[in-house]
Amino acid sequence: MIGFIGAGKAGCSLARYFRKNGGEISGFYSRSDIPEDFIRFDTAEQIVESSDMIFITVSDSAIGAVWRGIDSSAVRGKLIYHISGAESSAVFCGADPDMVCSAHPLLAFSSKETPAEQIKRAFFTLEGGDTAVRAVSALLDRCGNRYAVIKPEVKPLYHAAACFASNLVTAVCAEAEKMLCRCGFAEEDALSALAPLIEENVRNVCEKGIRPSLTGPVSRGDAETVEKHLAVLEGLSRDIYTQLSAVLAEISGHTELLPLLRKKRFQ
């Protein structure tokens, strides 16, 4: 039996997904509303006692407090999980280290009813004790999800990688949107104008890989165009451009552009 503490978007979506794939869900303990098609428990201890696997699906900052609030005698022999990308299984202080695990899905849950097809495509990253990892691996095998096991000491680097591929992409898109507005685009048109470019680039990267998807002046070694860009960029936008272009120069093999990219604005 699988129980959930916390009824947010991720918890509710995963409960439905596991149930759809044959998992038995005991229910939820949560201070917020839970879906009507699940049993509600009045205390954390009650759901722990009624479950073999417990997923604590609260915000990262609340995991430790929720864990400390559960009677330690209730969790003996239970498999305990959280789904944070940033926290390791060490947040479950005092627990049997073999019985705890972080199981992070590389997916942004859009609602409490995230479609099963979306979750099935999610890659899960596991970190924790052998027994807990084996149990959740078996669950994910049944669901058809891919997963990898990492060591706790690389969890911050892992989470930074996830941020690079999601949050920081959003930041780059925001900078591009601002630049188009400076060119005279209406704010409501700027992002929609960029959308096909963004979508096609992400699709190419996912389908073809990094190197085959390279386009633009840096990938061609076009120093003249790069200089024109640098002449009109200032402040944070220029810093972002030069740093990311240096990465592209290394990937594409056009390292002759690096001195130009490292040159100060008015040097």
Where do the language-model regions lie?
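Predominantly flavin-linked oxidoreductase catalytic cores and closely associated redox partners
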Residues: 95, 106-115, 130-132, 211-219
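Rossmann-like NAD(P)(H) cofactor-binding subdomain of soluble oxidoreductases
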Residues: 14, 32-37, 41-115
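Interdomain hinge/lid region at the active-site interface
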Residues: 201-258, 267
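Amphipathic, non-transmembrane alpha-helical scaffold segments
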Residues: 55, 162-169, 234, 241, ...
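Internal alpha-helical scaffold of NAD(P)-dependent oxidoreductase catalytic cores
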Residues: 24, 33, 97, 115-206, ...
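NAD(P)+-binding Rossmann beta1-loop-alpha1 motif at the extreme N-terminus of oxidoreductases
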Residues: 1-46
